[in-house]
Amino acid sequence: MMSFERVAVLGLGKVGLLAATLLHEAGFEVLGIDANPTTEPLPFAVQADDVTSTEALVGEFGRVEAVLSCLPYHLNRAVAEAAHQCGIHYFDLTEDVPTTKAIVDLAATSNGVMAPQCGLAPGFVGIVGASLVAAFDHCRSLRLRVGALPQNPTGLLGYAFNWSPEGVVNEYLNDCEVIEDGVHKFVSAMEWKETIYVDGKHLEAFTTSGGLGTMCETYLGVVDNLDYKTIRYPGHMDLMNFFFHELLMRERRALAGEILTNAKPPVSEDIVYVHVASEGYVDGQLRRVEFVRSYVPHEVGGVRNTAIAWTTAGSVAAVIEMVRDGSLPQRGLLKQEQIPFDRFLATPTGRLFAG
């Protein structure tokens, strides 16, 4: 299966709708599927269907050559199984480690590409990181930092829930993979706090789960130190540790998400910070290379989209464009760190990330 045109996009929320629009603009024939699709006119076909039914999905997937799941992570396993059964390409945005492991198992016998974790982090940040590691004869550290924040925060938390509260709670509480001094290990989330500056703005970063995808497995024995941290405004981590651990909200994750979203609803004026830094040796000389960007809202298809929405949707759309063009593998597991950054930036959607 080389070039393909027909793509189903499951879940037409903000990110799914934007991803479908970007794929349509890149020349794909898009079929949007949602349990309760919008009635507003769209430039591609849309239909209502039960996205939780593997049987229903298998029926729909007979009409397409690839599927992008923008559904909540707990629904992705069934979608991946249906795609595997139909022999089509599969892409998703999941940060969930058990879901990804199930998809990795399916990829061993797939006829199409199985590409989980194609969003911002994991996803784009891993593509950037891999390009930096490749610049060294020996890499002693790769530090990946990403944060989606309100541009003009109020209050002590300095935050707004522009992303899934379920996803944020999980990444604040689940253990984090790292490589430390050549050893692959797990550490607690919301630790290892550091000060970071982007465009002169004072920020903090701390460990959160899921952002590395498969990178620890790939770079064990290659990179001495590898970790991922979330960027926030100063003071955020200490308050979240108080909320989850001293007040024991870690035992009531769903309620924690409700409380936080009610207090800090989404904003339209957001900013995504990406700070990727790597150190290592070239011809015996120690060097440091960085990729640092600040992404703000952007208009696509006549609609203004938040930074977190377009960076997430744009990353997966660019990867799908690359698979279509034959510049990526056509079957089996696709890891984000396998994706050449220069070719990513050369795609119609990837150009948005050049900054």
Which residues fall in each region the model found?
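Conserved N-terminal Rossmann-fold NAD(P)-binding element of oxidoreductases
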Residues: 7-11
